[in-house]
Curated annotation (Swiss-Prot):
GO cellular component: cytosol
Keyword Coiled coil recorded: no
Location, primary (coarse class): cytoplasm
CDD domains attached to this UniProt entry: S1_IF1 (cd04451)
SUPFAM superfamilies, alphabetized: Nucleic acid-binding proteins
Protein name as catalogued: Translation initiation factor IF-1
Alphabetized Pfam families for the sequence: eIF-1a
GO molecular function: ribosome binding; rRNA binding; translation initiation factor activity
The keyword RNA-binding belongs to this UniProt entry's keyword annotation: yes
């Protein structure tokens, strides 16, 4: 998948799930399942419920995404 094909949206973490997965509510109201990107995992950045995050979505499956940034 090419880097240009991703859709970047902002959302809020609702609940943590097992295996570094999170339920995220997007700004448009949709709820998706998101996992943590490798760089965030590598730098031990904690993601808690209520955090604002940026999520990358694939155009092929809009119900799953990757958390790429946590706002301070």
């Amino acid at each position: 998948m090419a880097k240009e094909d991703v859709i970047e949206v902002e959302g809020t973490v609702i609940e943590p799930l097992p295996n570094a997965m999170f339920r995220v509510e997007l700004e448009n109201g949709h709820k998706i399942l998101a996992h943590v990107s490798g760089k965030i995992r590598m730098h031990f950045i904690r993601i808690l419920p209520g955090d604002k995050v940026t999520v990358e979505l694939s155009p092929y499956d809009l119900t799953r995404g990757r958390i790429t940034y946590r706002y301070k």
